[in-house]
From Swiss-Prot:
Residue numbers bearing the Phosphoserine modification: 274, 320, 377
Job of this protein: Calcium-binding protein. Essential for maintaining the structural integrity of the sperm flagella.
Localization annotation: Cytoplasm; Mitochondrion inner membrane; Cell projection, Cilium, Flagellum; Cytoplasmic vesicle, Secretory vesicle, Acrosome
Main location: cytoplasm
List of residues that carry Phosphothreonine: 288
Chain spans, region Disordered: 1-21, 276-296, 336-396
GO cellular component term, pick one: sperm principal piece
GO BP term, pick one: spermatogenesis
Name recorded for this polypeptide: Calcium-binding and spermatid-specific protein 1
Length: 396
């Protein structure tokens, strides 16, 4: 640090003596002069961290540990050790012929050709030597992977042969790839191997791997495929059972549903046709014609359908065919009949109305109350008398 607190600024980089002994500096330029740019190659173990960009021919010098070594002697020493070579061939106007035979004219450019060689074995390299690939020298031929064998355009056939005793439908099949034989190379496919398991002698199975023609390949045991048709048949049966649907054209299915829901259909039928039965039984509905000049009661069919559908009372399916109906119009007529009976007695009119309303005298007092609810049990006898039927014969 300077006295004024600012860092010191050097006009030139430190000297070579301040660098580590494992670093090598390469200078480029004419007559070993220091150029404007320099590149440092640092060797950390066996790996190169940086590589020079420009190398000029006849101007190559290396400084390592403050010692200059001639280029030819350096290349000779590296050639003797079997290391990497860096061959610099550059010229301002030089033609370089490529591998394809095309001549490329390169001007004002420098080209660096790096020739890397592979050294088998562990190399104890010096500072500037880099070991790229290390192979073990004790590699057996059997340890080579089959994927690395170059078979060319030949096809690889996988053949198998099963020999021995097959018992309980169990056998071991070993598949081996048959590679074509390469020139000047031993055929590794012509070998036989037998495998025996820890079983008794009578159940021993021998599996032999060999190359056989495709026509002689034995078929697979049929026992392994006997279950496949059975599974297919079972699946088809399940599909036929599951795929059951009631079609609209199937009359038997509709008839079955009708029989099971007969009670419901009868009840609905009675509900929809109760108005028509009320028309047939005109005695059930008694209406008063207020517009009549004589003021007498008349049998009328006016507004019968709406009243029957609104106030009809339906019982069980069996009893509904007798149509136990108590229309609300009867209740209103009973109240009106009680008042008209007194008026008729004063005016000396016909006595037909009291005769008709006598069977309903028991219900007229009950209907006068405002909280009245229709109860078929209290008026059951009167309704049967109105229908002219005996209740004991039809009750269940």
């Amino acid at each position: 640090m300077a006295e004024d607190g600012l860092p010191k600024i050097y006009s030139h980089p430190p000297t070579e003596s301040s660098k580590t002994p494992t670093a090598a500096t390469i200078f480029f330029g004419a007559d070993n002069a220091i150029p404007k740019s320099e590149t440092t190659i640092t060797s950390e173990g066996d790996h190169v961290t940086s590589v020079n960009e420009y190398v000029l021919e006849s101007d190559f010098s290396t400084t390592a540990d403050n010692k200059l070594t001639p280029t030819k002697e350096k290349l000779r020493s590296e050639d003797d050790m079997g290391t990497d070579f860096i061959k610099s061939t550059t010229h301002l106007q030089k033609e370089i012929t490529s591998l394809t035979g095309t001549a490329n004219s390169i001007t004002r450019d420098s080209i660096t050709e790096n020739f890397m060689t592979v050294k088998i074995g562990n190399i104890s390299s010096p500072v500037t030597t880099v070991s790229l690939i290390d192979f073990s020298t004790d590699i057996a031929k059997e340890d080579i992977l089959l994927d690395t064998i170059d078979t060319g355009d030949a096809e690889i056939l996988i053949t198998s042969e099963v020999s021995g005793t097959l018992k309980d439908s169990s056998a071991g099949v070993a598949d081996t790839p048959a590679f074509p034989r390469i020139k000047d190379e031993a055929d590794m496919n012509n070998y036989n191997s037998s495998i025996k398991s820890n079983v008794p002698a009578d159940e021993a199975i021998q599996v032999t791997d060999s190359i056989i023609p495709e026509a002689e390949i034995p078929p697979a045991p049929e026992v392994n495929f006997t279950t496949i048709p059975d599974i297919t048949a079972l699946e088809e049966e399940k599909m036929t059972k599951i795929d059951l649907s009631v079609l609209e054209d199937d009359t038997s299915a509709v008839a079955t549903l009708t029989d099971s829901d007969e009670e419901k259909f009868i009840t609905v039928f009675e509900l929809t046709t109760s108005a028509e039965k009320d028309k047939d039984n005109q005695e059930d509905t008694l209406l008063t014609d207020e517009e009549s000049p004589e003021g007498a009661n008349m049998w009328m069919e006016r507004e019968t359908a709406t009243e029957a559908e609104t106030h009809s009372v339906l019982l069980t399916a069996v009893e509904s065919r007798y149509d136990f109906v108590v229309p609300a119009s009867i209740a209103t007529n009973l109240v009106e009949d009680s008042s008209t009976e007194e008026e008729l007695s004063e005016t000396d009119r016909t006595e037909t109305v009291p005769k008709i309303t006598e069977p309903f005298s028991g219900t007229s007092s009950v209907l006068d109350t405002p909280d009245y609810k229709e109860d078929t049990s209290t008026t059951e006898t009167d309704i049967f008398e109105l229908l002219k039927e005996e209740p004991d014969e039809f009750m269940i």
